[in-house]
Amino acid sequence: MLWDGTRFQRDRRLLLDDDGRIAAVGSVSELEGDPERMHGAMMPGLINGHSHAFQFALRGRAERFGLVQGSFWSWRDAMYDLVDSLDADRCHELSLASFNEMIDHGVTSVGEFHYVRHDDAQDHRLDDAVMVAAEDAGIRMVKLVTCYQTGDIGKPLEGAQARFDTVSVDEYLRRLDAIQSRLDGHLQTVGMVAHSVRAVSIEDIVRLHRVSVERGLPFHIHVEEVLEEIESCQAAHGCTPMRLLLDRGVVTPNVVAIHCTHSQPEDMRDYVAAGGQVCLCPITEGNLGDGIADIPVMRECGASLSVGTDLNSRTDLLEELRWLEYVQRVARQKRGVIVDADGDTGRELLRIGTEGGARALGLDAGRIEAGALADLVLFDHEHDSLAAADEDELAAALIFGASGSVISRVIVDGVDT
């Protein structure tokens, strides 16, 4: 069976070319040749829109709270302790573990939002460690090179934050060019990032965004994950972070806002109208106690959604998609919050995890059609957890009833990983 963007269909065939792309898709009778026969259901590889691979090391480390309940900020303290001890070898080890696990769960592409570096701005060892890890794992990576300059709006970096410092926009752009020149050009590309309005001045965000548009690169930014970010921005600028970006023209179709947990409906409507996308990380937002995003408003105004594993406490994107819907059901006491025009939630979630992720990372992937990247996943549709589902039910059964354990084969760029 083959996913066609709306359902799984039997007796379909696809041909791959020598450049890692899909050459043709059709029925068994339409395409000639003696193809390899594969038993199972094939779909586009899942696309992880937002990852901090090194945070894989925090599993279990930040889950003890004593007499005081934790928060995003107490978790951040644990993350800073990790940052202080991170060297290139450890960064490679953690990144490789994250990427290998993603591959096992059917993720073929990842947006790696990397912001840790050595004190010397010319030292690229940690960037290199992440890139080598992705190459070793065989995963497609968009290296989201991050600008990070302040500890909060108008405040200097402190402590472990010194390892995030990009010094200036000019230095950031030199770093971006240097990293781009070192990539595996076939499986790795770059995107641009301003960490957040807390970590980059609005003037520099405007400049970075302008360069991203000129170069045709994705532009990612954390937006309104926690209430304190909004309060800080309102105190400094008299408006929310999202409104600040809108007022300064930093919203175009290449912009992806990460989280939007506490975004105001009117801000979100204007943001989507300007072409902005949203990447949600429901497992991380649940782990950190951030809150629940207003997905109905996003859907109502036609937002392009994707998902990411963020802190990588879990790297199973099927579980991430399941959480995306289930958290909304719990919050609203209703079922079927995220559905397509036919009222099907499984199919819509699968599109978010594939087509939506491809849009967020600027990849020609996430679909099975001629010309698209041959990043594919085969899973066992006769697995005990899926055997009762027919073709029309299979997407929902996969999202809500299975895990990465049903994945039997992962193909990236036309090659088995």
Model-derived features with residue positions:
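His/Asp/Glu-enriched, well-ordered alpha-helical/loop segment
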Residues: 247-254, 296-383
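Alpha-helical scaffold segments that flank or form the walls of functional sites
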Residues: 61-140, 170-185
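Metal-coordinating catalytic core of metallo-dependent amide/deamination hydrolases
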Residues: 119-261
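C-terminal cap of metal-dependent C-N hydrolases
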Residues: 373-417
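N-terminal metal-binding scaffold of metallo-dependent hydrolase/deaminase domains
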Residues: 1-31, 41-42
